[in-house]
Amino acid sequence: MTGNRSLVQRHRKKFVVSSVLFATLFATCAITVYFSKRWLYKQHLKMTEQRFVKEQIKRRFVQTQQDSLYTLYELMPVMTLVLAKDFDLDSIVEALKGKKLQKKLSKGEIAGNELENEGLSSGMSAMTPAPSVSAKSPQSADTTSVSETSTKSKAELWDDLKLKAITKIIILSYTTSLLMLLTRLQLNILARREYLDTAINSAMEKEREKKANQYSVLSWFSSWITEKSNNLPSEKADPRNSDGTIDTDTRSIASTANPEKSRYVNEQAFLSLSWWLLNRGYLQYKSIIEQLVKEEFQNSNPRDIMTMDEFSGKISKIFVTTNKQFFQQPQSNEMFISCLLPEPNLERFVLQQTLEQDALKVLYEDNLLLKQLVQETNKCLQSPGTWIVLESLIDETFHTIMEQIEDNVNSKSKPKSNDDDTKVVDISKNSYQIALFSIATKDCTNEMLKAGLVSMNNKFLQKLHSISALDDLSACVYSNFGL
């Protein structure tokens, strides 16, 4: 026993040192494992957060593009009403049917229920029904149009239908392409600003948390005490003076300072600028297209025969010549932008047409955000990449309408045996009368102006929406890359 005690006493220092070393090693390993796990956990959270942010940005981008399509569907009825003022094709068709009916009555050829099935031609008998209420022009315009068409001869009515149908579909092609481009730019600019603000706020919050974690418990406790003392009611400034009145400047700031409302009004004003294109901007190329259509089709008689390739070639020539006005003239840049956005001195006029008085008051007090958004849009519109996308949209529009017109012509090209006065198909293959092309073009415009927001069945808008170049441009704007 004494020997064991003496052995312990002799090696006491070794035992102490060994115990300390073992404890130190154990503590070091434990701390290392703890911090390693903590670091790995933070890295996992960081990667998960980054992946979540990327997915959120991607989802928001996809949703923004879908919103642009919804916006186009909502604006189609407006476009229908605007174009109906100068291109009311339905009234011309009704007048032609009236002429046909008068001719039948004068010959005494109508009997029984034949009235329902009468048509001016195989194309007219296969026409789509009259448009819905949303697509009709105002009653006063209808009355004027009917009075004008009723005094014209059958040949004049056919000539009007031919020129107006072709002019309308080309104007509609350019207007829809421009509107699709403008809507994509506007919504992606707004979406980018939104997610950048969110990212900045998130980064600032993380930076504050990081700085807070660097302090010791004592400093954190002292800062917490300081924060509590600063949040006491005495800190809140009383706008009242010593006599109980409220200072005028303070009252003005308190009543008008509403950043969220101001931001909302500015964004709505920015989106409402599309009114310019639908009501004023399109007039700049309307006269050009009308003149080109007259040059190509003025001398064509409704009974003249033309192949599908010949008709397509004439339409293509009009598109090419119009594109030169947009893209190859010295003043093309100014013309292009002036079609989409109003001049600065006309912005107030446009906003007065689209916003309510309360919103206008807010906008007059603070329109800085609107100016920034318009400036960004102008910068995007001046980019060569934007012009390339517009050319792609117009090119896709041309191919789409020609495919639709060809389908319409083929579906209406079966002649009726008793309809010798209105036979529109030539004996030679793939040759049709101009009258049939006019009817087919009119029906194509009705298809292009479909506004079924619930059914989303406008194939024309769907094709434009799916153009890859448009998605690439949207991605550049959304991600804040240079164009």
Curated annotation (Swiss-Prot):
GO terms for biological process: protein import into peroxisome membrane. One of its GO terms (cellular component) is peroxisomal membrane. Residues 242-253 have a biased composition (Polar residues). This is Peroxisomal biogenesis factor 3. One of its GO terms (molecular function) is protein-macromolecule adaptor activity. Residues 119-149, 230-253 are annotated as: Disordered. Residues 36-483 are cytoplasmic. Keywords: Membrane, Peroxisome, Peroxisome biogenesis, Transmembrane, Transmembrane helix. The lineage of its organism: Eukaryota, Fungi, Dikarya, Ascomycota, Saccharomycotina. Signal peptide: none annotated. It comes from Kluyveromyces lactis (strain ATCC 8585 / CBS 2359 / DSM 70799 / NBRC 1267 / NRRL Y-1140 / WM37) (Yeast). It is a single-pass membrane protein. The chain crosses the membrane at residues 15-35. It comes from the Eukaryota. Belongs to the peroxin-3 family. The keyword Isomerase does not apply. Involved in peroxisome biosynthesis. It holds the Pfam family Peroxin-3.
